[in-house]
């Protein structure tokens, strides 16, 4: 029997008198086939360390611990710590850290692995309400995660992996794909969770690029420009640029110069620009004095 078997999950929750907290976005997976598929997608073996976020009662952790060198699981809910000590008691390669991953000193934490030099992967069922902040925190942390295989709301997975000229494409697609490739591996129906969420989930596989997709003069400014492109999705890039930077004649002259330098038509919509085009635009805007 597995932790994720519905009867075991129910028994664990009842034994510990656990009640779900909506504020933590808790939905526990009760399908062992899907858990195995997650581990297979992440290609977990004894040559890698794994960071898990939000282990819940340890359903995914059990599968990870059986396959990885070591697992470090971050759990924010104090009430789950004694439950995890119970469900994972047979494993000596799991560390449960009772901390908010967003407030954790990850550089120090990963030194606590027995072999911290092994490749590092993130495998997690992320809380819906805080998926994007967690992902961006990890991606921007400068820790050399090899890849992420994470479950999230299907709509968010579609946005992260979206291509230009699609409804889902936006500044989040650009922010992630600048650092990583992103592809939806498979869909997880809402019916396999306790309690069932309102929408289906997706497993997103993200692999870190050896270098960012493009080279830009100023990364922060590049991400700012990418956000500007999507201020009003149905309006032109020119409208969005003037909405953000201003509409004085001097500013409009500079914007025209930058668009010419970047070889981008002002009438294009932000959702049609590729990441390299946003990079060219950001560098051109810098060059003309923004």
From Swiss-Prot:
It holds the Pfam family RrnaAD. InterPro entries: KsgA/Erm (IPR001737), rRNA_Ade_diMease-like_C (IPR023165), rRNA_Ade_Mease_Trfase_CS (IPR020596), rRNA_Ade_methylase_Trfase_N (IPR020598), rRNA_adenine_dimethylase (IPR011530), SAM-dependent_MTases_sf (IPR029063). CDD domains: AdoMet_MTases (cd02440). The keyword Zinc does not apply. Keywords: Cytoplasm, Methyltransferase, RNA-binding, rRNA processing, S-adenosyl-L-methionine, Transferase. Its main location: cytoplasm. S-adenosyl-L-methionine binds at residues 27, 29, 54, 75, 100, 125. Belongs to the class I-like SAM-binding methyltransferase superfamily. rRNA adenine N(6)-methyltransferase family. RsmA subfamily. This is Ribosomal RNA small subunit methyltransferase A. It comes from Streptococcus uberis (strain ATCC BAA-854 / 0140J). The lineage of its organism: Bacteria, Bacillati, Bacillota, Bacilli, Lactobacillales.
């Amino acid at each position: 029997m597995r932790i994720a078997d519905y009867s075991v999950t129910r028994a664990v929750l009842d034994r510990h008198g656990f009640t779900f907290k909506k504020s933590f976005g808790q939905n526990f997976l009760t399908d062992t086939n899907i858990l195995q598929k997650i581990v297979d997608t992440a290609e977990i073996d004894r040559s890698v360390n794994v960071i898990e976020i939000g282990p819940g009662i340890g359903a995914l952790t059990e599968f990870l611990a059986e396959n990885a060198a070591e697992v470090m699981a971050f759990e924010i809910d104090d009430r789950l710590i004694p439950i995890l000590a119970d469900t994972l008691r047979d494993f000596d390669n799991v560390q449960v850290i009772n901390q908010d991953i967003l407030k954790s000193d990850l550089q120090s934490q990963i030194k606590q692995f027995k072999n911290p030099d092994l490749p590092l992967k993130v495998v997690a069922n992320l809380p819906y309400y805080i998926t994007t902040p967690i992902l961006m925190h990890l991606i921007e942390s400068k820790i050399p995660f090899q890849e992420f295989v994470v479950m999230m709301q299907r709509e968010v997975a579609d946005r992260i992996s979206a291509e230009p000229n699609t409804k889902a494409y936006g500044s989040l697609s650009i922010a992630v794909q600048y650092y990583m490739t992103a592809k939806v591996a498979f869909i997880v129906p809402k019916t396999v969770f306790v309690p069932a969420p309102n929408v289906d989930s997706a497993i997103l596989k993200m692999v870190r690029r050896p270098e960012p997709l493009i080279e830009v003069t100023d990364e922060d400014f590049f991400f700012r420009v990418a956000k500007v492109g999507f201020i009003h999705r149905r309006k032109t890039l020119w409208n969005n640029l003037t909405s953000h930077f201003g509409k004085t004649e001097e500013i409009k002259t500079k914007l025209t110069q930058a668009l010419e330098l970047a070889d981008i038509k002002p009438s294009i919509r932000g959702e049609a620009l590729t990441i390299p085009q946003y990079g060219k635009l950001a560098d051109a805007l810098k060059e003309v004095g923004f």
